[in-house]
Amino acid sequence: TRNYVEAIRAVLPGGDVITVRRGSSMARGRDFDLVTESGRHITGRLPSYTVPKVKSAAGYYIDENMDLIDLFIGAEGTLGVITEIELKLVKAPAMRIGTVAFLQDRQSALVLVRALRKEALPEGTSPLPVLPLSIEYFDRRALALLKDQQQSNPAFSQLQPLPDGTPEAVYAEFDGADDDKAWEILSGLGTLVERSGGNEHDTWVALDGQKMEKLRFFRHACPECVNIQVDRCRKSDPRITKLGTDMSVPAQYLDPALDMYEKDLTDAGLNFVIFGHIGQNHLHVNVIPRSIEEYDKAKALYMGWARTVSAWGGSVAAEHGIGKLKVPFLRAMYSDSQLEEMAALKAVFDADGLLCAGNIFSSSPDSDMVSAVSASPASGADADTEEKESLI
């Protein structure tokens, strides 16, 4: 997302306003100097940590000599209130192709995913002429949940009939450009599906707006089905909430991550589905707890996964940020000293901790370092020019 943000205007806690345009304000190594519209200089030092080389929205984005507009993007409102934003638009594809391929098992689905990403090809096949615009994955439990809702809930009646058995699904969208390119993509995709263990004749294809809407309904129906199930469970115990991961891993850990999720959840006897943005190694594991005991058991598993994913070089929050509920996950990803650096960065912009209390950092003064940082500015920066960083 950040690559499409060209400029922002933000109001800081003291009332100062700052405008940052991409390419106009750069860090010098880890040091930065921003100038507000009133002429005040905001200076400080960026944290020393390195962000993981995966899709991530966990804490502040930090890099050597970085464009300082990226500090504010994904900062969860902890540095300033963004009042204006300028975006870069891209031309819509002339022909968008939507597809859903059904595979016999997870390994077959991963073979197709890697072929679509041009990482590894089944024997005797060629890569597609273009990379997909998106690749999504749905495990057999997710499809079973969809099928159950399709049969019992009129709201899901527009779903196309799902195949019999317990297949897995890979959804992909492409820029077809024109009829010739669309045919080349679909012909090649059919071969890849067959060589990955699927049947090209079972594959759903959409080439027009109406059919694309049906495929997109399928793509987005699974989270809604999970919400319906969780709402039913909440009637017996209102403490139960939806439990869904937002973790991403480096490509080489995609298989181990899926193995870990399935083994741990199956051994624990929990009801779950797995779906999400497999093109970026970013899957959502959703547990549907039937009791508060299962809810607590799932939360403990999630914490363990956060530690493992972090050790692999992944992110505990790939797209939804840390917020307030995932603060413990951030502690699994970064050390106390790195969190202190984040807090110092926030204090440069918000010395009194007025913005989004509890986001990224705990709002409890004895469980986080925010109050200490506010009272003791980082070295080399004035008390009113320190900022802290956020991951939730």
Task: Name what the model sees in each region.
Residues 207-210, 322-327:
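Short, highly charged C-terminal tails/helix-capping segments
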Residues 1-122, 372-377, 382-392:
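FAD-binding subdomain of flavoenzyme oxidoreductases
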Residues 312-322, 347, 351-355:
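Alpha-helix capping/hinge segments and adjacent helical runs
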Residues 327-392:
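Activity-critical C-terminal alpha-helical subdomain
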Residues 73-75, 81-304, 308, 312:
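C-terminal substrate-recognition/cap domain of FAD-linked oxidoreductases
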